[in-house]
Amino acid sequence: MQNISSDTIQKHPPLSLPFYYGWLVVSLCFLTTLTSAGVRSSPQVLILPLQDEFGWSRALIASAISMNLLLFGVAGPISGYLIDRFGPRKVMMGSLLLLICGVSGTIAMTQFWQFFLVWGIIVGLGAGGVGSVLTATVGNRWFVARRGLALGILGSASSTGQLIFLPFFMAMIAYSGWRIGSMTLIVVALILLPLIFLFMRDDPADIGLEPYGADQTGAGGSAGAASLRG
């Protein structure tokens, strides 16, 4: 009897919302991908400050950025495997933890190999964990109707993250220095972690729901008439 009671409790959404729970899942995934893209692109803004403080050449710094981009791409298949095995929620949290560790290491670094490790490798892998594979998985698991809208929102997260974070990071560096600017990136990621832990779910069935529009026949024809309310 106790097992039945526990299962029943787990089938309820953690929040009572006036709209379909999948839109909250999309929002969390969007914010995570946006933050990841912003952090991943931030080293471009660090080139001049690092040159001035450590005397590293532009080519040397660019080599770490290139490694970051390489691992971001290589991490895609790894991310897909981990999502299949552990679910989007754990992969999102693990990726954010890697980003937090990488940016935190930046604040204490004194040598180039440390910069290469934290930004080139750790941040590159962390950002790759929440790329297009994650957004496609979330969109397809949670939506039948409005799937195109959900995927479109998630697909815009990467470019939006760069659009928001780069000017913000540049302003923080100009007013407070690059270390304080890096700390703001950590704060943003730390805010997201408990939200994902509490409210992110891997699949609609985990909270007793079906994918949005799954109960409609001819979901493709009726998707345009479906509202945001589930």
Regions found by a protein language model. Give the residues of each.
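Extracytoplasmic
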Residues: Y21-I61, A75-S79, L166
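Helix-breaking motifs and short loop linkers at transmembrane-helix boundaries and internal kinks
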Residues: G55, G87, A108-W113, F143-V144
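C-terminal ends and interior cores of transmembrane alpha-helices
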Residues: L97-Q111
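Cytoplasmic helix-loop-helix junction between adjacent transmembrane helices
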Residues: W119-S156
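Helix-loop-helix hairpin linking two adjacent transmembrane segments in secondary transporters
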Residues: L154-I207
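Cytosolic juxtamembrane N-terminal segment immediately preceding the first transmembrane helix
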Residues: Q2-T32, A37, S227-L228
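Central cavity-lining transmembrane alpha-helices of secondary-active solute carriers
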Residues: S66-Y81
